[in-house]
Amino acid sequence: MSGEVPPNINIKEPRWDQSTFIGRASHFFTVTDPRNILLTNEQLENARKVVHDYRQGIVPAGLTENELWRAKYAYDSAFHPDTGEKMTLIGRMSAQVPMNMTITGCMMTFYRTTPAVLFWQWINQSFNAVVNYTNRSGDAPLTVNELGTAYVSATTGAVATALGLNALTKRVSPLIGRFVPFAAVAAANCINIPLMRQRELKVGIPVTDENGTRLGESTNAAKQAITQVVISRILMAAPGMAIPPFIMNTLEKKAFLKRFPWMSAPIQVTLVGFCLVFATPLCCALFPQKSSMSVTSLEDELQASIQRTHPEIRRVYFNKGL
C-alpha cells in the first residue's frame, strides 16, 4: 500500500512476519543496508520525529505507508531499541558490511607475520568491542573497568589464537594457513561478546509480556540471548573467511597476481564484501530479534513473581541484541 497511511499500523514491530526465517531475513536486509550509514543527522531526526509522532497518534498530512516504513527503518538503523539513544556510527548494523569487509580482507591478506597478526587482530577486536557494546540488550550501562576487561581479554584471546595456530600451520599447506584468521575471530567472539555483555549476565536483561509490559530482569534470558548472538556472529563471519581463501589460493598462482601482487588485498576485500552482503542479514535472521522463553525456564524468584501477578503468562519476551 502506498496511499495515505492508516492510523493502526504497529511500527513497534518489523514490517515482515518475524516468526519465519524469510520474514526475519527481509527485515535484516533492510536494517543492515550499508546505505543507511549515509543518512544525515537531519534525516535521522526527521525519521525519529515521524516514528514518535505516529506512536502517539499524530499522522503528518500526506504521509504514505511506504514513507512511514522508510522512516521506521531509518530510525531502527540508528537508534538503540531499548534505550532510544543514537548509536555510534561504526557500531550500527548498517556499518557491518563496509567495516568488516575491510578489516576481514586485510586480516586474511596480512596473516603471515607476527606484527601483521597483532595489528589486524587488535583492529578487529577494537571494532568488535564497539559493535558488541552498541548492540547490547537492555539499558544497563557497563563500567569503564568492565569495558576495559572485555576489550583486553578478547584482544588477547584473538591474538593468542592466531599466533598459536600460525605456529602450528607452518608445516602444513598454505591453504590451511589461510583459515587461521577465522579461527581467531571465532575464539574472540566467544570471549568478547559475553564479556562485553557481562552486566547482563550479572543483573539480567528486561523481559516483557507479548505486549511489551516489563515483568522484571532475567539472567537466564541473558544467557540465551548471548549464546544466540555468539552463534550468529561466528556463522556471519564464516562465508567471508572460508570461501575467499580457496579463490585466493588459486588466483595467487596465476600470472596476473604474480605480476601485480598489490592487487591481492583489494581482491580479497571485494570477495569478503560480496559474502558479507548476504551473510550479515541472513545470520542475523537465524534467531528472532524479539526472542522468547518459557516462564518455567526463568529464575525461581522471577517465576514466582510472574505467576503471582500475571498467572496467565506462559512465555516472556526480550531483545536478544545483535
Swiss-Prot record:
One of its GO terms (biological process) is serine import into mitochondrion. Keywords: Acetylation, Amino-acid transport, Membrane, Mitochondrion, Mitochondrion inner membrane, One-carbon metabolism, Transmembrane, Transmembrane helix, Transport. The chain crosses the membrane at residues 103-120, 147-167, 175-195, 229-249, 267-287. Coiled coil: none annotated. It is a multi-pass membrane protein. It is found in: Mitochondrion inner membrane. GO terms for cellular component: mitochondrial inner membrane; mitochondrion. The modification N-acetylserine is found at residue 2. Widely expressed, with highest expression in kidney and liver. The keyword Mitochondrion applies. NCBIfam families: mtc (TIGR00798). This is Sideroflexin-1. It comes from Mus musculus (Mouse). The lineage of its organism: Eukaryota, Metazoa, Chordata, Craniata, Vertebrata.
